[in-house]
Amino acid sequence: MQLEAISITDHEYLTRLPSNDEIEIINGVEVSVSWEELEESNAYAGLHLLLYFIKKDSPVEIFLEEIRRLKEIRNLEIIDNLQNEGLDIDKSELNNFKTRVPGRPHIASILKNKGYVNSINEAFIKYLGNGKIGDSRSHQPDIKKIIELSKESKSLVFLAHPHTLMSNEKFSKSENWVNETFFSHIQDLASFGINGLESSYSSYNKSITGQISNIAKKLNLLECGGSDYHGDIKPNINLGFGYENTPIKVPYEFLEIMKEKHAQL
């Protein structure tokens, strides 16, 4: 088995890398979004969309600049809220990270390094998750808007790590969330115009991947896969590895179908 293709989907920031003779590179980006219909329940952990085949200066690429601006405002508000709670954290500490667009995971890392929490996950549970003082959904674009912009831009849009629709657990290995409510939410997303689901994911076993794959087929949606590698921010995920540290395998057929779909747009 060898790596034939890859897409590096940074949050809210698109980097265009050229393909070469050995590895095919697909441009892409990951975007955090809100979904108003689910806001009241506070049940989901945070929704992310994966966008692929983004044309230069397309509507969705232009809108990414606005998303980054809102994210910077949100980061400062979160830190202000944490300071008001008595936590010793300064805005300048975000500059210590080698990233163009710091996010909540970086704030979580600061909290962990200062001993306020024992893990990144605990930081989200106590301070940064939905309904907490670091809740950031008010600064996130609506999911329907991003899907619509993606359609206008002739890009493909997928739901990343689908368990976040149903679970507050950061890495859910339980299968309880793959149920009728989950299927209903995916039906809604399909009606909005989403193209597919991330069925292969680092914390999914074969059973969960199979169930999501079956839902995708039932609703005529495409499939993609990824490790969700974030470096030190997610130390339990190794680059290219998935469930129980086995190599994550995403069929090249997924990309072939994606390219066929994209050519029809």
Regions found by a protein language model. Give the residues of each.
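Glycine-rich, phosphate-binding/catalytic loops in enzymes
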Residues: 23-24, 174-176, 241-243
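Active-site gating loops and adjacent loop-to-helix segments of metal-dependent hydrolytic enzymes
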Residues: 29, 34-72, 112-132, 239-262
